């Protein structure tokens, strides 16, 4: 295997040479440099939550995510890395040694490993190529009470409903076409995890959920207990969208998307604490503001255009705030904003 030495965050590691293999997708071991932000934000989250953690990454690739957790978060007591590829497992060992990190390395099927680690892990991070859905049940088997589950999904087109049959088959949900389809896709992922959690008698509380171009990412605190699982399911339901109207419901109809997570997508306080580290602080600041608004949707400026002309985002936010409506930009659309008011009230404030 042809390798190159790379650096990300505070670690160095070997990865397949993309020039030799043509693309990252053709290489014998997968490493995607475009996921650096994903990994960095995850490190900041663990650093914020505290130490002494048993962390498992069952789809490790080069091992860079787990190694960064160990080196940068200062929160890892035991690190378990795994990949079904024998080449990947050997490369993980090489990268652990390069960084002086102690870790257990396995060459196994991810679900088999997670079942073997029953009730062992404080953190399970599912970072697959495609959908995390096949691994979520097993992840809950591996998690301890009061643990953390992180999941990345790159099958964004499925989650936003572009492929309805696959969305129903994979996530047991339907997502309609709306101006805020990105948010529905993210809530689709979190809602799926919440329902799987409940089937394993776990509740979830999202700490950080976001969209970044080609993927969705969520990290949820989990707690064991049937009663808490029942309570968490109160945050699962449907979003109804018709022109000029948005509402939530517990029963589906021909205009609804769901079942989705209707509750908060993250914790504003944790985002504020993460931002203090000075890395991706602007992005974390946007998330902090978004998470403080309960509505499970956002608005887009073209929805309020008159003769094809709509206010700028800055103008819209100013008008809303002058009308006493709390509003903030959203990271999910450059022309989008969240507001603690209904469509009619927002429209009256803008015009």
Swiss-Prot record:
Superkingdom:
Archaea
The residues the record assigns to binding S-adenosyl-L-methionine are 39, 65, 83, 109-110
Q: Which residues form the Trm1 methyltransferase domain?
A: 4-350
UniProt keyword list? Methyltransferase, RNA-binding, S-adenosyl-L-methionine, Transferase, tRNA processing, tRNA-binding
Spell out the CDD domains in the cross-references.
AdoMet_MTases
EC number(s) recorded for this UniProt protein = 2.1.1.216
Q: Belongs to which family?
A: Belongs to the class I-like SAM-binding methyltransferase superfamily. Trm1 family.
Which PANTHER family does the UniProt entry name for this protein? Answer: N 2 ,N 2 -DIMETHYLGUANOSINE TRNA METHYLTRANSFERASE, TRNA (GUANINE(26)-N(2))-DIMETHYLTRANSFERASE
Q: Its biological function? A: Dimethylates a single guanine residue at position 26 of a number of tRNAs using S-adenosyl-L-methionine as donor of the methyl groups.
| Protein name, entry field | tRNA (guanine(26)-N(2))-dimethyltransferase
Organism of this sequence:
Pyrobaculum neutrophilum (strain DSM 2338 / JCM 9278 / NBRC 100436 / V24Sta)
Q: Which gene encodes it?
A: trm1
């Amino acid at each position: 295997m042809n390798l190159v030495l790379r650096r990300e965050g505070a670690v160095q590691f070997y990865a397949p040479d993309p020039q030799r293999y043509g693309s990252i997708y053709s290489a014998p071991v997968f490493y995607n440099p475009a996921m650096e932000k994903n990994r960095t934000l995850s490190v900041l989250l663990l650093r914020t939550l505290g130490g002494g953690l048993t962390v498992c990454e069952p789809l490790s690739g080069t091992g860079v995510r787990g190694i960064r957790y160990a080196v940068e978060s200062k929160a890892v007591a035991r690190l378990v890395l795994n990949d079904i590829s024998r080449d990947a497992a050997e490369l993980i060992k090489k990268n652990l040694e390069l960084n002086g990190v102690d870790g257990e390395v396995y060459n196994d099927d991810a679900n088999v490993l997670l079942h073997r680690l029953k009730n062992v892990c404080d953190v399970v991070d599912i970072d697959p190529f495609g959908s995390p859905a096949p691994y979520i049940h097993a992840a809950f088997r591996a998690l301890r009470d009061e643990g953390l589950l992180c999941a990345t999904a790159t099958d964004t087109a499925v989650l936003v409903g572009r492929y309805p049959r696959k969305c129903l088959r994979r996530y047991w949900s339907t997502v309609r076409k709306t101006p805020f389809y990105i948010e529905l896709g993210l809530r689709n992922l979190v809602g799926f995890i919440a329902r799987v959690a409940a089937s394993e008698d776990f509740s979830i509380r999202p700490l950080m959920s976001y969209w970044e171009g080609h993927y969705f990412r969520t990290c949820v605190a989990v707690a064991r207990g049937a009663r808490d699982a029942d309570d968490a399911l109160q945050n699962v339901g449907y979003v109804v969208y018709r022109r000029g109207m948005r509402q939530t419901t517990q029963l589906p109809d021909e205009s609804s998307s769901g079942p989705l997570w209707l509750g908060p997508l993250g914790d504003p306080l944790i985002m504020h604490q993460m931002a203090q580290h000075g890395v991706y602080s602007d992005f974390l600041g946007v998330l902090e503001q978004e998470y403080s608004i309960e509505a499970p949707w956002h608005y887009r400026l073209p929805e309020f255009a008159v003769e094809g002309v709509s206010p700028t985002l800055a103008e819209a936010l100013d008008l809303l705030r002058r009308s006493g409506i709390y509003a903030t930009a959203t990271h999910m659309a450059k022309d989008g904003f969240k507001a603690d008011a209904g469509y009619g009230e927002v429209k009256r404030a803008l015009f």
